[in-house]
């Protein structure tokens, strides 16, 4: 394997150093000022300055192009489109998008915690809160996996295996997801030192009651992520691919961003970038499992780090 040129290594080191300095400056600003707005404005300015510095390098712009536009064009080249499809109304696209709308509506109005509280108002059960998360996760499996799979079973010529559930592309490109996790991990570790983080995670506040509680919650959480990846990066992307090609990614990120409404704005905006990256990788590798691995790995890491600030298992006192 050819070694990267020294100029490339030097550039990467400068970029890593500049990002580190920017992050340190943002955290220094948070500790030095009591003004929330000053911290927010300063963080935005520092972030924009860092972005401008990174994009000022032609080599970096070339790298960005290689992992974005070049990949989308490759997806379009791989997509088999019948000439007869051009300019025609697609019943398949209509069905796919209607199923997406119905499934998301069910999540909001029936599969939510508020709906669980309406249907099961008796909170006296020891595991009432955990059952609430089972309700939430179960509806994700139903709406994101079961309903789409039933839909595909009735669509002529469609095979569920074609909807990015193969492991073949996952193993071949596992290193990409390992690099992504390595980049995300330090950010998660830094975030875990904040009070806001410790008061938010784990979402199941009784996760420290017992090992059974913890791993039951993690299993429900993982099932939800698997379902989400199949729905957005499998069912929706592959369902639209023949007619839209790589443009299907940009259709997908709209509802994917919207399911994050109600969360902090940085997380919701971050979902746009995450959707683009995971969508591109899913279409290129024809596998959703990398996205599942990233989601489950990051979520489990966040919970484990958050548990450091929780009372001990069996103490009778719960997280946040």
Kindly give the residue locations of the regions a language model identified.
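Hydrophobic alpha-helical transmembrane segments
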Residues: 12, 16, 94-98, 173-178, ...
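Aromatic-anchored segments of alpha-helical transmembrane domains
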Residues: 19-29, 101-109, 123-125, 182-191, ...
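Alpha-helical transmembrane segments in multi-pass membrane proteins
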Residues: 33-53, 88-155
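Membrane-embedded alpha-helical segments of multi-pass membrane proteins
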Residues: 42-48, 138-147, 211-215, 219, ...
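Membrane-interface helix/loop boundary segments of multi-pass membrane proteins
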Residues: 166, 227-251, 280-287
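Functionally important transmembrane alpha-helices
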Residues: 249-253, 257-259, 265-320
């Amino acid at each position: 394997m050819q070694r990267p040129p020294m100029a490339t290594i030097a550039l990467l080191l400068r970029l890593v150093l500049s990002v580190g300095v920017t992050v340190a400056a943002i955290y220094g600003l948070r500790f030095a000022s009591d003004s929330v707005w000053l911290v927010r404005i300063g963080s935005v300015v520092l972030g924009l300055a860092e972005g401008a510095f990174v994009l000022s390098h032609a080599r970096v712009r070339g790298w960005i192009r290689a992992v974005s536009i070049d990949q989308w064009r490759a997806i379009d080249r791989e997509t088999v489109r019948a000439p007869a499809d051009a300019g025609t109304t697609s019943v398949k696209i209509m069905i796919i998008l209607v199923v997406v709308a119905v499934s998301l509506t069910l999540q909001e109005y029936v599969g939510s915690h508020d709906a669980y509280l309406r249907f099961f108002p008796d909170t006296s059960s020891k595991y009432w809160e955990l059952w609430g998360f089972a309700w939430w996760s179960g509806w994700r499996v139903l709406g994101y996996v079961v309903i789409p799979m039933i839909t595909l079973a009735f669509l002529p010529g469609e095979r569920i295996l074609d909807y990015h559930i193969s492991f073949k592309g996952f193993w071949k490109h596992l290193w990409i997801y390992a690099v992504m996790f390595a980049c995300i991990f330090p950010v998660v570790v830094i975030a875990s030192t904040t009070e806001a983080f410790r008061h938010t995670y784990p979402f199941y506040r009784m996760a420290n009651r017992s090992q059974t509680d913890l791993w039951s919650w993690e299993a429900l959480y993982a099932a939800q992520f698997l379902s989400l990846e199949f729905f957005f990066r499998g069912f929706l992307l592959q369902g639209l691919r023949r007619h839209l090609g790589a443009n299907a990614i940009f259709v997908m990120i709209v509802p994917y961003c919207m399911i994050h409404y109600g969360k902090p704005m940085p997380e919701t905006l971050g979902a746009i970038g995450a959707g683009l990256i995971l969508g591109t990788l899913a279409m290129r590798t024809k596998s959703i499992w990398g996205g599942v691995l990233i989601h489950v790995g990051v979520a489990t890491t966040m919970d484990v780090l958050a548990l450091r600030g929780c009372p001990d298992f069996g103490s009778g006192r719960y997280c946040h």
